[in-house]
Structures are given as structure tokens and as C-alpha cells.
Regions:
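Glycine-rich phosphate-binding/hydrolytic loop that grips phosphoryl groups
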Residues: 310-342
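Small-residue (GG/TT-enriched) beta-loop-alpha framework at ligand/catalytic clefts
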Residues: 3-6, 11-28, 64, 70, ...
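Adenine-nucleotide phosphate-binding core of ATP-dependent small-molecule kinases
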Residues: 223-280, 288
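Short glycine-rich phosphate-binding loop at a beta-alpha junction
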Residues: 63-75, 152, 158-161, 275-288
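Active-site neighborhood for divalent-cation/phosphate handling
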Residues: 72-177, 312-316
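Non-catalytic, solvent-exposed interaction/assembly segments
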Residues: 1-101, 105, 146
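Glycine-rich phosphate-binding loops at beta-strand->alpha-helix junctions
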Residues: 278-305
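Phosphate-interacting basic helix/loop segments used at nucleotide- and nucleic-acid interfaces
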Residues: 49-62, 179-189, 268-269
Length: 342
């Protein structure tokens, strides 16, 4: 069995699957809350507690697996577009040029990072000349990679894939056939994936299925939850945002979150537009469905843009077995396995 392990500052998510030819069968899903301070911005602060929580979760749900999949998406990842001469073809030579670029312009020690790069496709708005190759470079701190490898070892799992969430979402987009029972071909649009949680806002932007840029803000909706002290009030957030309800501190927390979210999303889209000459057609919001559809509706109204809260998804060649069923909070973990199946 293949198991994807996804965790935020507040929760851990497990998705177990098996692959049969080109089909991915998702057989088990489980999640648990994490004590405060165990994980911070994707960094493992307390590896013993994290290992214990995951081990208990696996035991409770009778989960067995051999391989572990991880994906990373946080502020410590450096993503930068680098142009190199088309004549440079050898990977070692390219890595040397990329390392020099990072050291010169970002003032980092490249030996402390795991560096990956992939060629970017030219677009009609900003075509490259024939003598230049454009690369998207990712630099991940080695210390974080070692934390994840250590976690897999402590769980007695083989770390099969260590990836970036931006890459896994790219493959996820390819498999989507419908969202909220409406047919979608997301690889034919310019789309934004917006991940909302208690602790962060993650934005990933794609042009016709190809990753362009991402941005991560440590600004979750935790304060909103602390003032929405009952479920009925949580369901009325759009009314709070539009001043139809006077809720004092909740209104203030919501207004601050919306302002920060708007700026974060627009700043990320501005970079996307500067790189491609295009704008995002639709933003797809995912996370805890009890609050995300409310926040998506507020962003749609506030920004006059298309924000769609993901409630269900139909995939190509992805099957749900037993008690496993779609849940938007598990999209990042599911995307890890879909990337492997591709």
C-alpha cells in the first residue's frame, strides 16, 4: 500500500491507496488534530509527538503501508525563475549556474539546500529567444528534508516520494473531470488553487495546467473561529461580512482576514500576470468545508471574482473503496498519490 502523509500546523491527514495499472484506488483516509507546537510552517518541531500521533492514527484505522509520500509547501521554499544559455545542457553544469545565481542574488548558501529545476514552457506573451532556456528553480532546506526522512524512518516506512505541493497539484488538475457536479477541464483554463486553514493561506496558480507561481502566508482563520463561538454564527459569516449582523470582535477579525487574504491573492496573481500576460479565470478554494465555502463566498463578493469552494470532485481513473470518500481537506494528500499514479 502507498500512504500519503500531509500535515499542517494543526492537523495530520493520511490517505492510503493502491495502484492497479492506470487506476488509483483510495482505500482508507484518516485525520487527527495535532497539539500546538508540534509542527510550525511545515517544519517538524516535535518529531516524537508527531510520530506518536501518526502511529496511533494508523493503529486506530488498521492502516498498513510500506511506502510514505510527502509534499512540502511553505515559506522556506525558494522558487525562482532563472534563464540559462540554451547551449548548457549538462545537468551538473546547469546546477552549478543555478547555485551561483542563488548565492549571488539571494545571499544563501546553496550547499544547505536541495535544489531542483525544471524547464518552463515559453508563452506567446513573453516568448524566449532561441539562445535561452528558462528554468523554474526550487531550493528546499536540507534540514527540512532530513526531518521528513527521519519521520518516515521512525514510522518504519520507506520514503518513496518527497515532492513540492505545486507539482502534486499540477497532476491533480489533470485528473479532475468535474467539480461540484459540473464538468471541468482545468488544464484548459488559468486557475488558482487556494488552500485555507487555521494557520495559513496557500495560493498556487496554473496556466493551462502548468505551474507558474505560488505564495504562502502565515495568516489563517484561527481568530475568526475563536470569536464564532457556535456553529450557527459560523454559518452566518457572509452576513457578518456585509454588515447585516453586528458581532463586534468577530466582525473585526473577519474584516482583517479578508483584507489580508485579498492582498495575498492579488499579489500572487500580479506576479502570475507579469510572467504570462494573463489573468486567473477561477479560484478553487479547499480546506475545512464547514468554513471554506463561507469564506469563498465572502471573497467572491469582496473581490468580484470567481471563487468556488470545492465540495466534491470527480476524477479520471481514481476510485474510492470501502469507507473512503472525497473530502476537500484531503486534497493535498490525494494529489501526492495522483502524481505517483501519473
Amino acid at each position: 500500500n502507498l500512504m500519503a502523509i500531509d500535515f499542517t500546523d494543526e492537523s495530520v491527514y493520511l490517505v492510503v491507496a493502491r495502484q492497479k495499472r492506470n487506476e488509483l484506488e483510495i482505500i482508507k483516509m484518516a485525520s487527527a488534530n495535532l497539539p500546538e507546537g508540534v509542527v510550525l510552517n511545515s517544519e517538524i518541531i516535535d518529531p516524537i509527538t508527531l510520530k506518536d500521533v501518526i502511529s496511533d492514527l494508523m493503529e486506530q484505522h488498521s492502516i498498513t503501508a510500506k511506502y510514505a509520500f510527502f509534499a512540502l509547501g511553505n515559506t522556506n521554499i525558494i522558487a525562482r525563475s532563472v534563464d540559462v544559455a540554451a547551449s548548457v545542457q549538462n545537468d551538473e553544469d546547469i546546477e552549478g549556474l543555478v547555485s551561483y545565481e542563488l548565492q549571488q542574488y539571494l545571499d544563501i548558501d546553496p550547499t544547505s539546500y536541495v535544489i531542483q529545476f525544471q524547464e518552463q514552457e515559453s508563452n506567446s506573451a513573453f516568448p524566449l529567444d532561441e539562445d535561452t532556456r528558462s528554468l523554474m528553480v526550487y531550493a528546499v532546506p536540507k534540514s527540512i528534508v532530513e526531518q521528513y526522512l527521519g519521520l518516515a524512518n521512525n514510522l518504519k516506512l520507506t520514503p518513496y516520494v518527497f515532492d513540492l505541493q505545486s507539482n502534486t497539484f499540477e497532476k491533480w488538475l489533470e485528473r479532475v473531470q468535474a467539480i461540484n457536479n459540473r464538468a471541468k477541464r482545468l488544464t484548459q483554463e488559468n486557475v488558482g488553487m487556494v488552500h485555507l486553514s487555521k494557520s495559513f493561506i496557500g495560493v498556487y496558480l496554473y496556466s493551462e495546467g502548468k505551474f507558474v507561481t505560488s505564495n504562502y502566508l502565515n495568516r489563517g482563520y484561527k481568530d475568526i473561529l475563536s470569536y464564532a463561538d457556535d456553529a450557527s454564527l459560523l454559518q452566518k459569516l457572509p452576513a457578518v461580512a456585509s454588515d447585516d449582523l453586528d458581532t463586534g470582535l468577530l466582525k473585526h477579525a473577519l474584516d482583517e482576514w479578508v483584507a489580508d487574504a485579498k492582498n495575498h491573492i492579488l499579489n500572487t496573481e500580479n506576479f502570475f500576470s507579469g510572467s504570462t500576460g494573463l489573468n486567473i479565470d477561477s479560484f478553487y478554494v479547499f480546506g475545512d468545508q464547514d468554513i471554506c465555502w463561507q469564506l469563498a463566498a465572502i471573497l467572491k463578493q469582496s473581490m468580484n471574482r470567481e471563487f468556488i469552494s470545492i465540495d466534491n470532485v470527480d476524477y479520471e481513473n481514481v476510485l474510492w473503496e470501502g469507507s473512503a470518500e472525497f473530502n476537500a481537506e484531503f486534497i493535498p494528500a490525494t494529489a501526492m498519490l495522483i502524481r505517483r499514479a501519473n
